[in-house]
Amino acid sequence: MKNHILLILALIFTSCSISTETKVEEKSLEYFQSEVMKPLGLPFSDAVIVDDIIYLAGQVGNLPGTLELAPGGLQAEAKQAIENMKAVLEANGSSLNDVIKVTVMMDDISEWGDFNKEYIKYFTGENKPARSAFGTSGLALGARLEIECIALKRK
């Protein structure tokens, strides 16, 4: 009986001393600020890249390098916001074809149909990104919409 107890204790102590070291793969992390937007001194990055995934900050329909919204209403702002999104993606080795998820925030959700008229010009074909949308108020610069996305980095 003593031998059994000693054997059990030996097994317990031996198993406790075995290293179960888990190696965590180091992730690459990069913060991107476009040269066009840098002079504005905004308190956020245009994108954060973690390994091969790009997380874009929300894009409103501002004209590049300014805090002025594209004139012409919701569709003009939508077009400019998507163009801004496209520029950030392309500067980081990606494209609209690599977008995985889109989130749309709208000042007036009843304008959803007008937004979609512009959106479908950019996201065509069979493989469209997942998308969420919601109505809100108080968007930056008094914008009527803001779009953010997550995309795959190809290059």
Show the residue positions of the predicted features.
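Repetitive helical segments and hydrophobic/amphipathic motifs
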Residues: 11-12
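Sec-dependent signal peptide recognition
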Residues: 2-8
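N-terminal presequence-like segments and the immediate start of the first folded domain
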Residues: 5, 16-80, 87-92, 97, ...
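Surface-exposed aromatic
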Residues: 100-102
